[in-house]
């Protein structure tokens, strides 16, 4: 039990402010002890692949991801049905059952608490990932997906996402770019952009104008998914594609410490990038 902060806080508070000072010092000391306890709950060793600590770090990443998702969902003041459904859908995509699913649900609920220590949790994520860019990026993208659960990002959710991005070491510009990419990815997916023909392709020729407009929108979203302009040449397209695939390759992420439960989501992200690239490649006519 950690009471060092409480003792010091109460002592100096009483010394300078009497009884009321002691009470205030006790409160400050409690906050200090809480932050110290959370910090010590993290992982102090560096690097993945050190025997048992690998599993511990993966568990930290896993639970923190769902806890922060809960925090994002609560940003508007009330968690919507769509956000709960998204969290459940993510658990389904990760094939979480039994104890694992309960752990994810418990973490999500913890994130909704008013005094959720976001900064300390993000610091533990950075320690657990050894600050690896691609793992931190994957963590941030999970939170962006959660924010888009009900189709739009509320200003309060955007503010929380900026806090998360800063806590993980990303700039506001980097976050806004990823928000644009994720929004484009959702539209692209709804229009049948991932692996296969567009849903509306069987419609009659009388809808040709609508289909052409839809195809144009899909292409525009494909460029946004890769983070490039529509006038990018073949070399620029390939460079952006290879960079994103290198950052999101499931096997590489697993080797660096991504929890195995999140492997399917990493595969979906790489398929999203591949589908966008294939559409652009077909449009520009290069191999």
Swiss-Prot record:
A Gene Ontology molecular function term of the record: protein-folding chaperone binding
Span of domain J: 221-287
Membrane-topology descriptor: Single-pass type III membrane protein
Principal location class: membrane
Annotated localization: Cell inner membrane
Key words, A-Z: Cell inner membrane, Cell membrane, Chaperone, Membrane, Transmembrane, Transmembrane helix
One GO CC term on file: plasma membrane
Disulfide bond residue pairs: none
Positions of region (Disordered): 192-213
Intervals, Cytoplasmic compartment: 31-287
Functional summary from the UniProt entry: Regulatory DnaK co-chaperone. Direct interaction between DnaK and DjlA is needed for the induction of the wcaABCDE operon, involved in the synthesis of a colanic acid polysaccharide capsule, possibly through activation of the RcsB/RcsC phosphotransfer signaling pathway. The colanic acid capsule may help the bacterium survive conditions outside the host.
Protein name (record): Co-chaperone protein DjlA
Source organism (scientific name): Vibrio vulnificus (strain CMCP6)
């Amino acid at each position: 039990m950690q009471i060092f902060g409480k003792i010091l806080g109460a002592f100096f508070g009483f010394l300078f402010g009497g009884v009321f000072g002691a009470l205030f010092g006790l409160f400050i000391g409690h906050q200090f002890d809480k932050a110290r306890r959370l910090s010590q709950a993290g992982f102090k060793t560096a690097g993945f692949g050190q025997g048992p600590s690998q599993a511990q770090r993966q568990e930290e990443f896993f639970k923190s991801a769902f806890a922060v998702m809960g925090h994002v969902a609560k940003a508007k003041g009330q968690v919507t049905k769509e956000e709960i459904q998204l969290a459940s859908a993510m658990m389904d995509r990760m094939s979480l059952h039994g104890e694992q699913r309960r752990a994810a649900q418990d973490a999500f609920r913890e994130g909704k608490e008013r005094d959720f220590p976001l900064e300390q949790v993000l610091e533990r994520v950075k320690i657990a990932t050894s600050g690896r860019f691609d793992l931190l990026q994957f963590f941030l993208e999970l939170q962006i997906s959660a924010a888009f659960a009900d189709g739009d990002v509320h200003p309060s959710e955007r503010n929380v996402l900026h806090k998360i991005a800063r806590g993980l070491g990303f700039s506001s510009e980097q976050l806004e770019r990823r928000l644009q990419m994720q929004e484009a990815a959702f539209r692209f997916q709804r229009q049948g952009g991932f692996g296969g023909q567009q849903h509306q392709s069987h419609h009659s020729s009388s809808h040709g104008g609508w289909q052409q407009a839809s195809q144009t929108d899909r292409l525009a979203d494909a460029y946004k998914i890769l983070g490039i302009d529509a006038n990018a040449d073949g070399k620029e397209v390939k460079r952006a594609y290879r960079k994103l695939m290198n950052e999101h390759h499931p096997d590489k992420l697993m080797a660096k410490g991504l929890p195995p439960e999140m492997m399917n989501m990493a595969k979906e992200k790489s398929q999203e990038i591949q589908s966008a690239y294939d559409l652009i490649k077909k449009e520009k006519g290069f191999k």
